[in-house]
Amino acid sequence: MEKFMKKIKQLLFITFTLTIITGLFCFCGNTSYAKNAKKAYQHKVIAYQDSPAIYDFIPTGSAAGNRRALNHLISSDKPKIININNDISIDTYLRPGNNTTINAGNHTITSGSGVIINAPTAASYDNFKNLTINGGVWKNSSSSGLKGTMMRISYASDISINDATVYCNYTGHGIELIACNGVSINGCKLIPQGKCPKKCVEEQLQIDLATPKTAPGLYRLSPKLCNGTPSKNISVTNCTVSGARGICASFPGSESKYRKAGNYHSNITIENCNITGKSAEALALFNTKSATVKNCRVTTKTPLKRNSYSVGLAVAYQKGSSPKTSIKNKVVIENNIVKGGRQGIFIFSHTSKKFGKVIVKKNRAYARSGKRNAIRVISAKKKQVSKNKTK
């Protein structure tokens, strides 16, 4: 009996030891918390944590509380993924840090103001990086939309916005990119709200440079941020964009010091998009030295009396000092359906410099002013205009 009890004790000791070792192994090999651990902030549970970097957001019950809780989750620069699994309200902008992914699915995020913004601290493309937004219906609480910017991203690189629907007033911007390098916008819908003023020229997708007048919000942060830095390597694919203007790469209309070669945008690609303008051009690429527009439907509904604003697809150098003419800088307009007023497709330089190489081919272009104005390519060192159908 004594031997038997001794053996039992030995077995219990071995079992206990193995249990401790196994527990330690699991503790070290996985995480220091159980799956779906609760993440708390200000004494409230705000998320279930599925791994060190994945959070399933739990609504707090108030718009301000949701915004504070989400900003707590997204504001660091560590890699993290936040899943929004409910329709929620926020009172103002979310401010993500670097290396942030927000998965919103088909859920609606309604804000008392805008929805996404970053505040750069230096005039560098690397100041803010690695933001991905997947899905979501992003809107303002007003039925007429925000008369401002819903998503403003500046001095940033490696930005991706996919399958998002963004509502904004005609006089605002659904997405505004200021001095960005390396942005992909894919599968998104930018939808205007409210009434479109007859002379409105605001675009739902704005590709901008950083100057005091084009980016007053940045200027208020620091005048040093507004040095004329342009945007480059911007890709817009499989999107539907409608607005007073649809998509525009902007230039500083009243700031001649920022209309120089170093302030020109470059490498803008727009493919497989449906773009509509109601009171200005559907698609306007100003002061852009290299661009590709392919497989798009571009429609301007602007009255002819609006003159240049009634052009369907415009690519233009505005007055100032443009880049040296080089055939390395290409503008390619291919396989699009373009409907305009004064012109369908219009490529023109208002400076002493010409475009480098311009290719306009396999398009179907229409101008309400007459067939001869369907396609006009002026001021190009080398141009190929071929296999187009005009009306």
Task: Enumerate the predicted regions with their spans.
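Bacterial N-terminal signal peptides that target proteins for export
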Residues: 4-16
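Bacterial N-terminal signal peptides
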Residues: 14-26
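Extracellular beta-strand/beta-solenoid scaffold signature
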Residues: 67-71, 90-92, 111-124, 143-153, ...
